[in-house]
A protein has these predicted regions:
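Secretory targeting signatures
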Residues: 1-32
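Cellulosome-associated attachment modules in secreted, modular CAZymes
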Residues: 20-125
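Bacterial Sec-exported substrate-binding components of ABC uptake systems
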Residues: 37-41, 102, 114-156, 260-292, ...
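Sec-exported extracytoplasmic/periplasmic mature domains
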Residues: 67-74, 115-119, 149, 156-160, ...
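A short, structured surface patch at a secondary-structure boundary
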Residues: 142-206, 210-217
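Extracytoplasmic ligand-binding site segments that recognize negatively charged/polar headgroups
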Residues: 145, 170-177, 217-222, 237-251, ...
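Alpha-helical, coiled-coil/dimerization segments enriched in small aliphatic residues
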Residues: 172, 305-326
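Structured C-terminal subdomain patch of bacterial secreted/periplasmic proteins
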Residues: 221, 241-256, 263, 351-471
Length: 472
């Protein structure tokens, strides 16, 4: 791809300016801001033109819009969503039947949906992104640059590894995630550096069709403007922010013309999510188990960080349901909350450091030195009753999250039909990480306080269980 030297100069100047801002933000806070809770409806395929709000763009959507135009259906009753025209702007309503997202549903939308059903190349697709922003791309998406582990997972699930041309420094440059994504490295991709401050100059001679990105709080927020002169689209979908990722896989699958792989993944995840939803739909929120989930028992996470969402998906009640807000919480606060269950999220196991000894000792050491994990919740009734679960990142957030959700559901609803979590993990690993075995991860990604104590007592000389200090 040849570019006008003036355009190259403009792009480079913009990159330098944006990089300076991003470096400041990373040094100051580690991110670009606080993520907000998604305003999406129950629609999972978040592409405008999915008029009836199901998981497909097909002839049913054509008929739906035709019925609106003919007055047979009321537009007011059609599926809709609150969307931002620009990041951190003002919300406005858009109907999913509004394929070109111009604020009205008419013949133009009908024609566009027909093109979308027929998969006409060059069709401009409008979609709802991770930050509730109205975004667009050109169909079909092909070659790409990708950053962060859950995004690599998504491309692997879709069978789209061969189109990878650029990787971030967490996989490239022998980064910490390289061991999990060797098939991507086999494509000889170029490393573009950090997802916060990408080196966009590496794209200029062979620009990718799109960049698979994420929330502007944790990826360069100015990415769209910077790569626009290259003709590269930016796709920001929630591959970890909402824990479950079925909708994001379906959406990206359509955009890349890889619908079959997306639907196959959806069937796996829905085999868990639908059964849980059916079971808990009969239970009022106030009657569901209260679950306090977090990284190490010392804070209540914001929405849109994948933690509260896991509780909801597993059928639990969150601290927010009890009037709590995000922020730090000490042992006394946990005791006052009195959760039925407590869940920790570890940066170990599948897609992280694959070392059970390090993981278990990390919990122990952090408890003693920083009053985290079991030390932080020692006075809680949940700890007294051994109702503490630990999940690894690979099954806690992202495409593998339905496994962790099943594990939590099994425990908080022990009388419900139980999921075979080991089989779910085996299927996931064999399909998407065939270089590994599920037995490598079960004791790292899904374990509880009882099994943890048993292992530590048998393997760590001088191990002392954190005393239970709960008093009724």
């Amino acid at each position: 791809m040849n570019m006008n030297p003036k355009i190259i100069a403009i792009v480079i100047v913009a990159i330098l300016a944006i990089a300076a801002i991003a470096v400041f933000l990373v040094m100051k806070n580690g991110d670009n801001g606080t993520t907000s809770r998604s305003e999406a409806t129950d629609v999972r395929l978040t592409i405008f033109g999915n008029a009836n709000g199901d998981d497909y763009i097909d002839q049913n959507d054509v008929q739906y819009v035709q019925d609106i135009i003919d007055g047979k259906k009321s537009l007011e009753d059609a599926p809709k969503v609150q969307v931002l025209k620009q990041y951190k702007g003002t919300y406005t309503i858009r109907y999913w039947a509004d394929a070109n997202a111009d604020g009205k549903v008419d013949q133009t939308d009908l024609n566009q949906i027909k093109n979308m059903v027929n998969k006409v190349k060059g069709t401009k697709i409008y979609f709802f992104d991770v930050d509730s922003v109205l975004a667009s791309c050109t169909y079909p998406l092909t070659t790409y640059a990708v950053g962060y582990k859950s995004n690599y997972e998504a491309e692997a699930i879709l069978g789209n590894v061969a189109n990878c041309k650029y990787v971030c420094n967490q996989v490239g440059d022998n980064g910490g995630y390289a061991q999990w994504f060797k098939p991507f490295l086999d494509q000889n991709p170029v490393c573009f550096g950090s997802r916060f401050t990408p080196d966009y100059e590496v794209f200029k001679d062979n620009a990718p069709s799109y960049i698979l990105s994420g929330t502007r709080a944790w990826f360069d927020p100015n990415m769209e403007e910077t790569v626009a002169p290259l003709g590269t689209d930016v796709v920001r979908l929630p591959f970890w922010e909402d824990t479950t990722t079925v909708g994001s896989i379906l959406t990206l699958g359509y955009m890349c013309n890889l619908d079959a792989a997306a639907q196959a993944y959806a069937a796996k995840a829905d085999s868990v999510l639908d059964k849980i939803n059916d079971y808990v739909s009969k239970i009022d929120t106030a009657d569901r188990p209260l679950v306090f989930a977090g990284y190490n028992g010392t804070s209540i996470s914001t929405w849109h960080n994948g933690i509260q969402e896991l509780i909801v998906a597993a059928g639990g009640r969150t601290p927010y349901d009890e009037g709590y807000t995000n922020g730090s919480i000490d042992g006394e606060g946990v005791n006052a909350m009195n959760p039925d269950w407590i869940v920790f999220d570890m940066y170990y196991g599948l897609l992280e450091t694959n070392d059970q000894v390090k993981e278990y000792n990390y919990i122990y050491d952090q408890g003693k030195s920083n009053n985290r994990y079991f030390n932080a919740i020692a006075g809680s009734k949940a700890y007294y009753d051994d109702k503490v679960l630990i999940l690894g990142q690979g099954v806690y957030m992202g495409p593998g999250s339905y496994i962790g959700i099943a594990w939590v559901f099994n425990h908080i609803y022990p009388k419900a039909p139980q999921f075979d979590v080991a089989s779910l993990l085996k299927d996931y690993v064999e399909n998407y990480h065939p270089d590994y075995k599920n037995t490598d991860f079960m004791n790292q990604d899904c374990f509880d306080v009882t099994s943890y104590d048993a292992w530590m007592s048998s393997n760590v000389s001088g191990y002392q269980k954190v005393p239970k200090t709960y008093r009724a």
